[in-house]
């Protein structure tokens, strides 16, 4: 037993099906290696069932067998099979980012919709929290690369991930999988299906995934980065005739985990202050799984929904598809965001509730002639309610005092003298901070269509369109209780300076009461300019250091909206289209040429970092005489209010693509060469105290993708995928980057710079061999490896990463359906930091997420 545990073991697919079920439901059993892997693969990338060979789109397909053999549990693991897809998990389980061809966003803010759309059984999952659960009883996963807005709508400017699950069967069967691995990992998955009548079939699937954390909070003696999730999924299929089918799906899954560990990459100058307060930091250990905190990082997600799909043949040549769905997501997170044992940040918690309703209708033709069409409509309605808070902990006041040489607390008396409403002893008080409440609504309508016209037997001209109207509205009710951040230091210093000068001159003149009048000060300055300069310099030396405390004003007052100037609404309309010419040379080789556009609607910044646009407000204290602006004119200006963005404008994508596909007995390939352009890419960058949301004027990439499969002999199959990307910011004057000398972020002109996080080369290769040990037993050996060339992790910093993953499995399969598998993932255990960010409220400190360990 010890030997088996060393290499990893799982009991796989303990089937309760008879052999005939396994034949009718290949998605529920491993694909035998001796099968012809070049056989036609059916996909629905064009919203029609077509072979992969006949689909003129760059599509990567992961079958159920590949997912099983590589031990892929969720979309985070899927990137090891599709090199042009990159998935990154950030500070919580709910913050996962999907990137295709170097384009992608949508994490860290509920108001930002992703550029990569995720669909499960045709239903859009609008946020990553609704996408990251363990994959259900799947049939295949399709990754559509490049803009797909013509058929998939407003949030497909970079691509689509489409997960297709198995329908209920009219023959009784099922599957049970139980797995045990390192870190006490226990995974149980099962499904059962069968008929209730000749026209009604049902299925029920469930999963349970629990694992100890591979990281630890040293001072708390608690685990981090654990797994604790489960889900259940039920389906009803009613098919009274071959012309009508109704499929109803209901599902619920839950995540209750501690995630995600953060490593100290560089301990900046503030580290000394943390340690002086008795705090602990695992300094300069970029790949360590040991960290310090005051509370574990809580991640709780409830994801649920129901959908109904109707497929009806209206006439002999027309079919109607209707998909109606409701999705709900509840998210709760809480984190000690300073990532030290010093109690600097008390709470950083967030409660989010998302309700989404979608309705899609499609009318499809099936004419015998050269002309066929698809015409559809789509409705989207989403409501988000978000509340959260970030508060100071027990040590924050002392931390600020240490950094300011005592000036933070020592300034209270002076500042209270010119701000009489300030409470005493409240600078940096425990529990002060920001308190947020957002109500967000998004409503969108679209009509779309596609026409195929066969010019000749092999040549087809296609054209498609999508017209979308998207309306968003946000209402905020936010407040800051940070007393120190509410003070106008410029005005306070000006008042203290004037008072100090008046008092000094009054003393020299013997003025009763001790303070000279303005007229007396002016007369003194005229009569004795040298003396006045000396007095001014002396007073300035006393009061000007207060201006150096501005960086400690972390949480200034928030201007809520809608208000008299800002209506809190956006309205976007877009016409996306596709023009494609496809040519089939013969039954084995086909090609296509495509020009397509894509669209992503505006995204609101649902965080305390939401600020008025510069067109509405020019910041500055009244004593500095800032230029007039609408918000100031309306009397809405607040102390320390700054400008920024309320929302990022829409993304508009375009792609030029040429593809070539081949399929022979034992060998197939798909090649796509492209140039892709994205105008208005929505950039959301963390800068240590918050996120900067904006638009890059233009970002582009060019490259190619090659997917191939080779079966040289009956029992041996090889797969390979290669992606080459050459991206750059063509225009991004308002970017954000690190200063490598200080490790702090700031504005940067990134025009002409290669975006961080994008490899030039990415490859994924795999091999599967089947050995017939007897008539009733076979052995399936599988190995796959993916590698990405080095890339810059964070804009402006020298750190680079070159990720790789090696996975392997060995399966013994009995003819009666019982299988036993030993498996391992990430066996080479490479060390790198996929993400680096500035330390929270710790200038000069760098933090990051360490790469995960091997599992088996």
Report the location of each language-model feature.
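N-terminal Sec signal peptide and the immediately downstream disordered periplasmic leader
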Residues: 1-70, 76-80, 242, 312
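Periplasmic N-terminal accessory/gating domains of Gram-negative outer-membrane beta-barrel systems
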Residues: 29, 57-106, 116-134, 140-148
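C-terminal beta-signal and adjacent terminal beta-strands/loops
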Residues: 36, 391-397, 786-794, 812-856
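Outer-membrane beta-barrel translocator/receptor signature
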Residues: 70, 96, 113-115, 127, ...
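Periplasmic-side early beta-strands and strand-to-turn transitions of outer-membrane beta-barrels
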Residues: 162, 170-171, 177-179, 191-293, ...
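Solvent-exposed loop segments that connect transmembrane elements
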Residues: 215-223, 259-292, 336-347, 389-435, ...
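Membrane-embedded beta-barrel scaffold of Gram-negative outer-membrane proteins
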Residues: 309-313, 319-325, 329-335, 584-600, ...
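Gram-negative outer-membrane beta-barrel transporters
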Residues: 373-374, 668, 673-678, 694-795
């Amino acid at each position: 037993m010890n030997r088996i545990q060393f290499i990893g073991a799982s009991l796989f697919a303990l089937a309760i099906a008879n052999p005939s079920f396994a034949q009718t439901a290949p998605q529920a059993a491993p694909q035998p290696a001796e099968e012809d892997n070049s056989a036609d693969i059916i996909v629905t990338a064009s919203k029609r069932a077509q072979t992969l060979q006949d689909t003129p789109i760059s599509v990567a397909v992961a079958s159920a067998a590949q997912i099983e053999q590589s031990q892929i549990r969720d979309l985070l693991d899927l990137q090891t099979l599709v090199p042009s897809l990159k998935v990154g998990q950030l500070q919580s389980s709910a913050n996962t980012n999907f990137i295709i061809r170097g384009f992608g966003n949508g994490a860290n803010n509920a108001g930002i919709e992703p550029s990569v759309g995720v669909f499960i059984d045709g239903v859009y999952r609008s946020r990553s929290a609704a996408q990251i659960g363990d994959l259900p009883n799947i049939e295949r996963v399709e990754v559509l690369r490049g803009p797909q807005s013509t058929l998939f709508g407003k949030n497909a400017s970079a691509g689509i991930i489409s997960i297709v699950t198995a329908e209920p069967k009219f023959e009784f069967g099922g599957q049970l999988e139980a797995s045990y691995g390192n870190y006490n990992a226990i995974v149980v998955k099962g499904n059962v299906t069968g008929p209730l009548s000749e026209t009604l079939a049902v299925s029920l699937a469930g999963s349970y995934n629990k694992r100890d954390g591979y990281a630890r909070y040293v001072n708390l003696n608690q685990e981090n980065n654990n797994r604790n999730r489960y889900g259940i999924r039920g389906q009803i299929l009613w098919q009274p005739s071959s012309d009508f089918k109704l499929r109803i799906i209901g599902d619920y899954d839950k995540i209750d985990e501690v995630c995600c560990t953060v490593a100290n990459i560089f301990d900046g100058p503030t580290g000394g202050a943390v340690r002086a307060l008795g705090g602990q930091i695992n300094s300069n250990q970029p790949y360590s799984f040991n960290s310090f905190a005051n509370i574990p990082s809580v991640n709780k997600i409830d994801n649920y929904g129901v959908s109904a799909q109707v497929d009806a043949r209206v006439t002999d040549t027309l079919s109607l598809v209707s998909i109606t769905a409701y999705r709900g997501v509840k998210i709760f997170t809480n984190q000690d965001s300073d990532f030290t044992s010093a109690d600097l940040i008390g709470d950083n918690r967030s409660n989010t509730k998302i309700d989404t309703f979608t309705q899609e209708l499609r009318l499809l033709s099936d004419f015998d002639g050269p002309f066929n069409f698809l015409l559809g409509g789509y409705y989207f309605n989403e409501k988000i309610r978000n509340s959260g808070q970030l508060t100071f902990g027990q040590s924050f006041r002392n931390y600020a005092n240490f950094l300011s040489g005592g000036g933070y607390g020592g300034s209270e008396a002076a500042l209270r003298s010119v701000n009489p409403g300030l409470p005493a002893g409240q600078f940096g008080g425990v529990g002060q901070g920001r308190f947020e409440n957002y109500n967000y609504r998004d409503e969108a309508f679209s009509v779309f269509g596609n026409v195929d016209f066969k010019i000749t037997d092999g040549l087809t001209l296609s054209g498609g369109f999508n017209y979308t109207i998207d309306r968003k509205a946000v209402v905020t009710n936010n407040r800051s209780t940070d007393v120190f951040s509410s003070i106008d230091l410029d005005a306070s210093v000006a008042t203290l300076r004037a008072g100090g000068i008046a008092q000094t001159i009054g003393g020299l003149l013997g003025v009763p009461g001790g303070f000279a009048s303005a007229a007396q000060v002016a007369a003194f300055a005229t009569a004795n300019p040298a003396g006045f300069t000396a007095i001014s310099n002396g007073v300035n030396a006393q009061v000007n250091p207060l201006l150096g405390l501005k960086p400690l004003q972390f949480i200034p007052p928030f201007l809520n909206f809608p208000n008299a100037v800002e209506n809190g609404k956006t309205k976007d309309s877009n016409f996306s289209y596709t023009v494609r010419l496809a040519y089939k040379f013969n039954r084995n080789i086909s090609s296509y040429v495509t020009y397509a556009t894509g669209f992503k609607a505006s995204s609101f910044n649902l965080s305390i970092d939401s600020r008025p646009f510069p067109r509405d407000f020019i910041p500055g204290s009244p004593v500095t005489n800032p230029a007039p602006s609408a918000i100031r004119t309306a009397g809405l200006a607040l102390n320390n209010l700054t400008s920024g963005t309320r929302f990022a404008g829409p993304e508009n994508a375009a792609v030029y693509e040429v593809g070539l596909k081949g399929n022979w007995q034992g060998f197939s390939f798909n090649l796509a060469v492209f140039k892709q352009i994205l105008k208005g890419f929505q950039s959301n960058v963390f800068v240590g105290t918050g996120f900067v949301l904006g638009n890059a004027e233009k970002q582009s990439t060019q490259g190619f993708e090659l997917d191939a499969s080779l079966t040289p002999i009956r029992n041996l199959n090889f797969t390979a995928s290669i992606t080459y990307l050459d991206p750059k910011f063509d225009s991004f004057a308002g970017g954000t980057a690190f200063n490598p000398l200080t490790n702090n972020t700031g504005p940067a002109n990134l025009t002409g710079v290669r975006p961080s996080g994008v490899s030039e080369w990415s490859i994924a290769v795999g091999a599967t061999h089947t050995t017939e040990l007897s008539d009733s037993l076979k052995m399936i050996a599988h190995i796959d490896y993916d590698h990405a060339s080095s890339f810059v992790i964070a804009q402006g910093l020298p750190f680079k990463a070159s990720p790789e993953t090696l996975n392997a499995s060995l399966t013994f399969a009995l003819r009666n359906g019982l299988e036993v598998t030993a498996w391992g993932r990430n066996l080479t255990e490479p060390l790198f930091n996929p993400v680096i960010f500035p330390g929270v409220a710790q200038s000069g400190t760098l933090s990051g997420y360490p790469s995960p360990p091997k599992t088996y």
